[in-house]
């Protein structure tokens, strides 16, 4: 069991390293957690059942730490992807209301440019998308809201 658990954690460690690299490249304020080093525990002890039991307990703690790290980085990546989806939804709402406003188009253009940055400035994008949402809502509520607004 210990050999299999150790091998699984080593494989998971490599996957987490890839996730961390992706998040660091994508998100402007990524979590700051290290991926636990399974190799620091050394090889699986042979012979003594007490040592083996303690080793398995340490492996399980490493697994729990990896789950925490995985959750933190996955949540950060989802947050960045959520911003991209929100921009798509805001554009769709503008299209639905048939709004063609120069200022709204300019806000969308800035959002597009920020989405292309690596890492994405998530706090700035959040504020900008909030501004787009409020402005779009205001435009949609104006008399004669359909069509071009100058």
Predicted regions and their residues:
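Amphipathic, non-membrane alpha-helical rod segments
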Residues: 14-60, 99-138
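Long amphipathic alpha-helical segments
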Residues: 124-128, 145-150
């Amino acid at each position: 069991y210990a050999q299999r658990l150790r091998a699984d954690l080593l494989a998971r460690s490599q996957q987490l390293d890839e996730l961390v690299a992706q998040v660091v490249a994508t998100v402007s304020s990524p979590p700051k957690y290290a991926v636990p080093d399974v190799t620091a525990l050394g090889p699986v002890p042979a012979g003594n059942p007490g040592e083996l039991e303690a080793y398995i307990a340490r492996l399980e703690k490493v697994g729990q730490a990896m789950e925490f790290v995985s959750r933190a980085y996955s949540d950060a990546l989802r947050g960045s992807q959520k911003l991209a989806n929100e921009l798509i939804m805001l554009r769709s709402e503008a299209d639905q209301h048939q709004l063609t406003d120069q200022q709204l188009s300019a806000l969308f253009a800035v959002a597009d440019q920020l989405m292309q940055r690596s890492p994405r400035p998530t706090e700035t994008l959040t504020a900008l998308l909030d501004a787009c949402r409020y402005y779009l809502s205001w435009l949609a509520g104006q008399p004669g809201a359909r069509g071009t607004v100058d």
